[in-house]
Regions:
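Flexible, compositionally biased loop and terminal segments
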Residues: 1-223
Length: 223
């Protein structure tokens, strides 16, 4: 789920007292996850912060990180979902890293919720290759042997989402029709759905339309 359009929502709602729209966007998340529960969705990945977002003003970044920290606390406090942080944690401030590292599975059932924070698809693949090469070096293998033996399965084992199924459906709000690098490796066979609504205005009916659109498609893997 690419939660896009917060800032444009704020510009179109000047009386909302939310200059960047991030608080309004965060307030939608628990409601959305309830819809996912009702639809029996098993795994959800929410893109909260991209690596490119760090190019914004420090004031906006600090405000956004604070909201993300509060949102993670709220999600964990419900006790309804297993929350996992995925992304380049080293780019985040120490206080947020500590909070995210403290997240532990609390349920054997329920929706698995990935919060993609400081996430970039290219960065994820680079990190996966680095970790694979480090494993091979620790096992005493040469660089040449490690490169020769590298497979797609090896990279998948070191992705941030390792052990989880690839997404079947990717939804982006705000009308933008691009992925921006979201789940770049995992989405090779995913279906896409683009919704015109800004994320804070995203409704249950919009979600159901996305699911309905997906349900009537004939998925063609490998083409």
């Amino acid at each position: 789920m690419i939660l896009d359009g917060n800032r444009r929502w704020a510009k179109s709602n000047p009386t909302a007292h939310d200059p960047h729209g991030h608080k309004a966007g965060a307030g939608k998340i628990i409601e959305f996850l309830g819809w996912c529960e009702d639809a029996q969705v098993k795994v959800v990945t929410l893109w909260l912060l991209s690596t490119d977002n760090f190019k914004r003003s420090q004031e906006e970044i600090d405000a956004l990180l604070k909201i993300i920290g509060e949102t993670v606390d709220e999600l964990a406090a419900t006790g309804r979902w297993n929350i996992k942080a995925v992304g380049a944690m080293d780019l985040l401030p120490a206080w947020l890293q500590e909070k995210l590292n403290a997240l532990k599975p609390i349920r054997k059932d329920g929706v698995e919720v990935n919060v993609a924070i400081s996430y970039g698809g290219r960065r994820e693949i680079v990190d996966a290759v680095k970790n694979y090469m480090s494993q091979e070096a620790n096992a005493g293998r040469s660089l040449a042997d490690a490169a020769t033996n590298l497979t797609t399965e090896d990279i998948s084992k070191f992705l941030y989402t390792a052990g989880q199924p690839d997404p079947e459906l990717l939804i982006r709000t705000s009308g933008e029709q691009r992925l921006g690098g979201f789940l770049l490796w995992q989405s090779a066979s995913s279906e896409y759905y683009f919704c015109e609504a800004y994320w804070p205005d995203f409704r249950r009916v919009d979600f159901l339309r996305a699911l309905r659109s997906y349900s009537v498609r004939q998925r063609r893997f490998g083409s």
